[in-house]
Amino acid sequence: MYAAMVLCVDDNVGRLQACLDELGISDNTLVVFLSDNGGPIANGSWNGQLRGNKGSLWEGGIRVPFALKWPGVIPAKKMNHTFVSSVDLLPTFAAVSGADQFGPVASDGMDLMPLLQGEPGEYRDRAFFWRRGDMKNVAVRYRNYKYIMNRRTNEEYLFDLHKDISERDNMA
């Protein structure tokens, strides 16, 4: 079933691209593709070397694919390993469209366009936070370090994700 879902997404992304081409707007359209979470265990999903799954605070639950395409604006076939978040989408879309970003409302997100175009930025110097809906588990990532606390058991975990992407060597 999972393979069929992936094939369906692939087919429909192709249909979307064909439609943009047919309308003559593919060169003036920012296409964004990302997932909301890692794969669930219930259907046999495998997150490779990443520990955890959908709904967990391990990398297998929160690290997702994120791809963008905008011919002539974002260089093609480039991989960027800077850690970003979906909260960066609103400020990015506002900047791209020229819209007044939020009025009186602030955002934790950052405009990704300078990063996507290869300009230096301060993207590495911010912390990212996650929690489970029940607040029993919380996590924070700063640069290459990630801390997780299970508030039910008071277990703490600290990982250097550059050296241990599988989150096996607890340094806490």
Enumerate the predicted regions with their spans:
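Short glycine- and hydrophobic/aromatic-rich loop-to-beta-strand nucleating segment
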Residues: 66-68
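Non-transmembrane alpha-helical segments in soluble domains
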Residues: 3, 10-13, 17, 21, ...
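C-terminal cap/loop subdomain of S1 sulfatases and analogous C-terminal strand-loop tails that border
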Residues: 39-45, 49-59, 74-78, 82-161, ...
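Metal-dependent active-site segment of extracytoplasmic phospho-/sulfohydrolases and closely related
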Residues: 7-45
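Glycine- and acidic
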Residues: 1-2, 75
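Soluble non-cytosolic domains of exported or imported proteins
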Residues: 3-10, 83-84, 106
